[in-house]
Design a protein with these regions (language model features):
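Strand-loop-strand
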Residues: 522-537
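Extracellular, beta-strand-rich repeat scaffolds characterized by small/acidic residue-biased motifs
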Residues: 36-38, 45, 55, 64, ...
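Acidic, glycine-rich calcium-binding repeat modules characteristic of RTX/beta-roll
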Residues: 49-61, 67-77, 92, 496-498
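Glycine- and acidic-residue-biased ligand/ion/polar-headgroup-sensing regions
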Residues: 39, 53-59, 74-76, 168, ...
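Extracellular, surface-exposed repeat architectures
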Residues: 1-45, 82-175, 250-258, 267-330, ...
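Long intrinsically disordered, low-complexity regions that are acidic and Ser/Thr-rich
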Residues: 200-251, 294-313
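His/acidic/aromatic-lined binding-pocket segments of jelly-roll/cupin-type domains
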Residues: 32-34, 50-52, 68-70, 181-182, ...
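A short acidic/small-residue loop/turn micro-motif
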Residues: 48-50, 65-68, 86, 179, ...
Length: 537
């Protein structure tokens, strides 16, 4: 369709399947172009008008092709075929209402202050597999993006500032699935699940001016009936007549996958019902996995206003703890890491922490399946397990090196320290209560060592499943050893020591007397190797 010097105005365009309409005419600026049908509208001229898309593809070939774009139903797609082909306001002139639609960057970078998406029906992707597209979200106050991000995209949330802008919080409660990086500078990023919306009753009384003609107010009856049943079955959250609440148990799980998350002077948190996979590289940043705070958009599902071309959001935050998962490796400098209640962290990538303290709260579990080094200590109120490195597509394991310069500090009776599966651990252990310390596992459970590392494993592990080097100061704790060797290099004290098929080897400095004090000792097929000065014996 071609035209010069005139505008088109009509009910809209319905394009059939596998059909393409090349649009080289102008649509009337005082009307809204409606596009339906599964076919493609290829827009070749800047329109100066708005468009609403219910189905099919719309290709944008000019800068600012439309003033505003509206997508609904989830069946429409906008494809960028030129840089800056969207608008230049904070929403880039595109609005995703109920069930949204897809924005395909198609190899073009795109910047938003906020993405006007009302639910997880919105997807931003890049179908160009050869050219990475940068999706920049630069909000400077709290904002929740409910949609999905996938394809060949690099996501950035960078604030141009000398100082960290803690209010510049980007909250993702949809999903991310990319093999590329995520980058955050001078700002905050949260990944979490999404509180499921519930139907609610009207909050006002029924309108009936002639009372004697009014029937039963069934809304009130239903509310009272629902409330009584929910009290009976301990599901009171269903009777609060709120679309969402922090104490409700039904949250959708958000899944977030990326290559590496780069943090510079930034805050990153994983809150309830989030499953995050990827590596983290942090500098002067704070990482919280299992954050006790969560966020709710009180207008979720109803964010799009003003006839489809505006966006509103009201965010609440409160305590709301749920299970979180993180899988990857962490490299951090001059940062801090906190692992919160109900967090499960699997460090399957190498972890190097320089001047970066880490704490593991009660109820949290950390499994280090790769080497871990820290120049600080590790505070443990939950559970830390250190292991060897499982080889992909194989049952063999490479020994894992774990080192804490300031040692491992166990607090409370629920603290649990475990080293097994070809782990070599160095660092003193301190426990202030009846903690549990487990070294090694039965020989029948010990995995096969990778053939390329047999000699190295023998040097590290002395033929045992696990090797530990350091002193243990834990007068109330229990230490269990099974197929393990303990190189005891300084004064140690333990409430209970149980050894099976193991060795305790005193390796203190020459000329220094090393003492192991144990209140209760159980030995099964084990050895204690003590050095002696035979010339003076």
């Amino acid at each position: 369709i071609n035209g010069q010097g005139f505008t088109f105005k009509g009910a809209g365009i319905d394009i059939g399947k596998e059909s393409i309409v090349n649009w080289n005419a102008l649509y009337s600026s005082d009307d809204v172009l409606h596009k339906i049908g599964p076919g493609t509208l290829n827009v070749q001229k800047k329109q100066g008008a708005n468009i609403k898309i219910g189905e099919g593809n719309v290709i944008l070939n000019e800068e600012g092709t439309f003033n505003n774009i509206y997508l609904a139903s989830g069946n429409g797609k906008v494809i960028l075929n030129k840089d800056n082909s969207l608008g230049n306001d904070q929403y880039a002139g595109i609005f995703f209402t109920k069930r949204g639609g897809t924005l395909d960057l198609n190899g073009h970078n795109q910047t938003f202050t906020r993405i006007a998406a009302t639910d997880d029906g919105t997807t931003i992707t890049n179908s160009d597999t050869t050219k990475e597209a940068v999706l920049a979200i630069n909000n400077e106050d709290s904002y929740i993006y409910h949609g999905n991000i996938n394809g060949n995209i690099k996501l950035t949330h960078n604030i141009n500032s000398q100082d960290k802008k803690t209010n510049a919080k980007l909250i993702l409660d949809g999903s991310v699935n990319t093999k590329n990086d995520v980058e955050v500078s001078n700002a905050s990023l949260t990944m979490q699940g999404h509180a499921t919306e519930h139907a609610i009753f009207r909050s006002t009384a029924s309108h009936c001016s002639l009372v004697f003609l009014c029937g039963t107010d069934w809304v009130t009856v239903l509310k009272e009936t629902e409330s009584s049943y929910n009290k009976k079955f301990n599901s009171d959250y269903k009777s609060n007549n709120q679309q969402t609440s922090f104490d409700q148990p039904d949250w959708k799980t958000g899944v977030f996958k990326f290559d590496t998350l780069h943090l510079n002077n930034a805050d990153f948190s994983i809150s309830r019902n989030a499953n995050v996979e990827g590596n983290i590289s942090a500098n002067k940043s704070a990482i919280t996995i299992g954050d006790k705070n969560a966020y709710i958009d009180n207008l979720a599902g109803k964010n799009i206003t003003n006839n489809g071309f505006d966006f509103k959001q009201t965010i609440s935050t409160n305590l709301s703890i749920g299970e979180t998962k993180f899988t990857g490796g962490i490299t951090a400098h001059n940062s801090q890491i906190a692992i919160g209640d109900q967090a499960v962290v699997t460090l399957n990538g190498a972890t190097f922490l320089n001047n970066t303290p880490i704490s593991i709260d009660k109820g949290a579990k950390v499994i280090a399946q790769n080497s871990m080094f820290t120049t600080k200590g590790i505070d443990i109120s939950g559970e830390l397990t250190m292991m060897g490195i499982p080889e992909q597509n194989s049952k063999t394991v490479t020994p894992g090196l774990h080192y804490a310069a300031d040692g491992f500090r166990l607090s409370g009776g629920n603290a649990n320290f475990i080293a097994r599966n070809m782990a070599s651990v160095t660092g003193n252990i301190y426990a202030d209560d009846a903690a549990t310390i487990t070294l090694g596992q039965p020989e029948t459970e010990t995995p096969t060592i990778s053939s390329a590392y047999q000699a190295w494993a023998e040097t590290l592990l002395y033929g045992f499943d696990t090797a530990y080097r350091g002193a243990i100061t834990a007068p109330k704790a229990t230490v269990s050893m099974n197929n393990a060797i303990w190189h005891l290099n300084s004064q140690s004290s333990i409430n209970r020591l149980e050894t099976k098929d193991s060795m305790v080897r005193f390796t203190g400095d020459n000329g220094k007397f090393t003492t192991l004090t144990v209140d209760n000792l159980t030995i099964d097929d084990s050895a204690f190797v003590l050095r002696a000065n035979l010339a003076q014996a």
